[in-house]
Curated annotation (Swiss-Prot):
Lineage of the organism: Eukaryota, Metazoa, Chordata, Craniata, Vertebrata
This protein's GO CC annotations: chromosome; nucleus
Name of protein: HORMA domain-containing protein 1
Role summary: Plays a key role in meiotic progression by ensuring that sufficient numbers of processed DNA double-strand breaks (DSBs) are available for successful homology search, promoting synaptonemal-complex formation independently and playing key role in the male mid-pachytene checkpoint and the female meiotic prophase checkpoint.
Residue intervals of the HORMA domain: 24-224
Principal location class: nucleus
Protein localization: Nucleus; Chromosome
PROSITE patterns: HORMA (PS50815)
Keywords: Chromosome, Differentiation, Meiosis, Nucleus, Oogenesis, Spermatogenesis
Length: 386
C-alpha cells in the first residue's frame, strides 16, 4: 500500500530538477516554471474550463496544469504557443513573453491585464539577489529550487486575491527577442511577425513584481500588470514597496512586490478545500530534457483561434465569485447603477458605466533593464481571432 502511494505521488508530481549544475537542467527548470505559471494564471483567472487542467503537486503545492483537450481548442492552442516559446528559449533568442488579456476583440492592442515573463541568459554565473557567503554549486542549486517554489506560491497568492476579470475576455501572447542575436527571419512555430506599437492599457494600471529565479545559466523575472480596481480588496500585508535603485520623478509610481514572508507563512494553507479536492487528471504540458512536448504539429489543422475568447458564468446579484472561491462584493454605488440601468431603455444601455480611460502601456517597466528603443522584433500568434 505504501509503495503504491509513493508511486502515485511520483506520477502526480511536477518535479523540479534537484540539481541545476548544467545548462540542460537549468533549461528544464525555466520551462517548467513557465508552464506552471501560465497554467496557474489561466486557471485562477477562469480563462478555460476545469476539464482543461490536470492536477499535480509541486513540492507541497497542489497546482493545476493546462493540457491539450480536443473539447477545449483554446487550451490546445495555448499549449502550442508554449511550444513556440520553448523553441525561442532553447535558442536563447527569447527576451520576454507577454500573456495579455483584453476585452474588445476588435482592439487587441488595448489590454486589461497582462503578465510578463522576462528571460536573461548568463554564462558566467547568475545575477542573484540571494548571494551566499559560501558560493558553491550546492548552495546555488538549493537556492534556485527554493526561489522557484516561492515564486509559484506568490503567484498563487496574488491570483487568489485579485478581483475578477470582465465576463468576456480574449487572450493573446506576444514574444520579444534579443535582436542582436536573433535572426531577422526567425519565427517560432505557430507565430508570425507582429507589432506592439501603440499598446494601451484599459483603466489605471498597477505594476506588480512577483519575483525572480536565477540559475547559473538563466534568470527569469515575473511581473503582473492589472487594473487598479482589482486591487482594492487585497490586504496591504500581501505587498511590500519595491525599493527603487534610481531616483523617481513625481509622475512615476513605484512598483509593488509580493511579500516573501507572507508566501512562506502560507505553506500550511495550501491544503485548503478549494485546492486539495480537485480531481487528478493527466499531465500533458511537461518539459522533458530534450524540450519536446507531445502534441499535434499540424499547423493547418482546425485548432480554433489563436486568440481565444473566453466566458465566465454570469455574476450573482451580490457579487462576483472567482475560481479560487473568493467572493468579491459589489460596491453599493455599482449595485445602484445596475438597477438604474435595468430600468433604462435599450438605447441607453451604453451609459451603464462610465467609459474607462486608456493609457499608453510601458512594456518593459524595469528600471534595471537597459533602454530597448532598438528592439523592434516581435511575434504574435499566427491565426488572429476573426
Amino acid at each position: 500500500m505504501a509503495t503504491a502511494q509513493m508511486h502515485r505521488n511520483k506520477v502526480n508530481s511536477v518535479a523540479l530538477p534537484s540539481r541545476v549544475a548544467t545548462e540542460t537542467q537549468s533549461l528544464i527548470l525555466v520551462k517548467r516554471l513557465l508552464a506552471v505559471s501560465v497554467s496557474c494564471i489561466t486557471y485562477l483567472r477562469g480563462l478555460f474550463p476545469e476539464y482543461a487542467y490536470g492536477t499535480r503537486y509541486l513540492d507541497d503545492i497542489c497546482v493545476k496544469i493546462l493540457r491539450e483537450d480536443k473539447s477545449c481548442p483554446g487550451s490546445t492552442q495555448l499549449v502550442k504557443w508554449m511550444l513556440g516559446c520553448y523553441d525561442a528559449l532553447q535558442k536563447k533568442y527569447l527576451r520576454m513573453v507577454m500573456l495579455a488579456i483584453y476585452t474588445d476583440p476588435e482592439d487587441p492592442q488595448t489590454v486589461t491585464e497582462c503578465y510578463q515573463f522576462k528571460f536573461k541568459y548568463t554564462a558566467s554565473g547568475p545575477v542573484m539577489d540571494f548571494v551566499s557567503n559560501n558560493s558553491n554549486s550546492v548552495s546555488t542549486c538549493s537556492d534556485a529550487k527554493k526561489t522557484s517554489i516561492l515564486l509559484i506560491r506568490k503567484l498563487y497568492i496574488l491570483m487568489q486575491n485579485l478581483g475578477p476579470l470582465p465576463n468576456d475576455v480574449c487572450l493573446t501572447m506576444k514574444l520579444f527577442y534579443y535582436d542582436e542575436v536573433t535572426p531577422a527571419d526567425y519565427q517560432p512555430p505557430g507565430f508570425k511577425e507582429g507589432t506592439c506599437e501603440g499598446l494601451m492599457f484599459e483603466g489605471e494600471p498597477m505594476y506588480l513584481n512577483v519575483g525572480e529565479v536565477a540559475t547559473p545559466f538563466h534568470v527569469l523575472k515575473v511581473k503582473v500588470t492589472t487594473e487598479k480596481e482589482r486591487m482594492e480588496n487585497i490586504e496591504k500585508s500581501i505587498f511590500k514597496k519595491q525599493a527603487s535603485k534610481q531616483p523617481q520623478t513625481d509622475e512615476e509610481k513605484p512598483d509593488l512586490s509580493i511579500n516573501d514572508d507572507l508566501a512562506q507563512d502560507n505553506n500550511g494553507d495550501r491544503k485548503r478545500d478549494d485546492i486539495e479536492t480537485l480531481k487528478v487528471e493527466d499531465l500533458n504540458l511537461t518539459c522533458q530534457e530534450d524540450g519536446n512536448l507531445q502534441s499535434d504539429d499540424s499547423q493547418n489543422s482546425a485548432l480554433a483561434d489563436s486568440q481565444e475568447k473566453t466566458s465566465q458564468a454570469a455574476p450573482p446579484a451580490f457579487g462576483r465569485k472567482t475560481r479560487s472561491g473568493r467572493i468579491f462584493q459589489k460596491p453599493d454605488l455599482e449595485l445602484k447603477n445596475q438597477k438604474e440601468s435595468a430600468r433604462a431603455s435599450k438605447g441607453n444601455q451604453q451609459a451603464r458605466k462610465p467609459e474607462k480611460r486608456s493609457q499608453s502601456f510601458e512594456i518593459t517597466g524595469s528600471q534595471e533593464d537597459p533602454a530597448v528603443a532598438k528592439r523592434r522584433k516581435f511575434s504574435e500568434p499566427r491565426t488572429p481571432l476573426n
